[in-house]
Amino acid sequence: PEEDKYGTQRVISFLRQIVEQGGFWNPRDHLWVQTQNTQFVGACNPPTDPGRVPLSSRFLSHAPVLFVDYPEMQSLIQIYSTFNSALLSSKPLLMGMESSLTRAMVEFYERNKQHFLLEQQPQYVYSPRELSRWMRSLYAAMEGLPNITPAEFVRLVAHDALRLFCDRLVTAEEKTWCQETMNDVFLSIFSEVDRSVLQGPILFSRWLGGGY
């Protein structure tokens, strides 16, 4: 949480008081509220990430801190294979594509993560959240497409890749790199799909529903 004008993180100070004093003062009832057997467990990003504020060192003196890095590529493939199997389970024409879909998503994510660094632009932050957003957007788009074909599906996956990864980029050169990298990854993994499927511009829209 952000600091107030006095440099205090009020929520963190409240938690520290409970840890140190074993309770807090209730100003409405003018009573001291005692707490017992209380544990606080939280997760946060490093303070070096954009928009983050370092936690109070006084509070951290009471808390063991464990650093958990992002999953490696093989772990990401295993995690998102499970999600994508559920995603495609109701689409008979797409059965058997979950492995290719997962490899394409993770490979494209990893290439972007390695190529675009936080030092270049503050929005160039890449985490597995991108893969989760990608998967959820595919789920939302496919709700009304029970008979989507493999070619249409790959084009939809490419559309969401462009929205998630390419639209945040600043320069034309970066956008070109992103587009070419996506084409390279998709054509090598979805080898059964014709190159014309990735021809731009790609925009999916539901005109009757007013969304896209």
Where are these regions (language model features)?
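Alpha-helical lid/collar subdomain of P-loop NTPases
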Residues: 36-41, 61-64, 69-212
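Switch/connector loops and helix/strand junctions flanking conserved nucleotide-binding motifs
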Residues: 2-3, 48-54, 74-78
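Conserved catalytic/switch belt of AAA+ P-loop NTPases
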Residues: 1-45, 57, 83-84
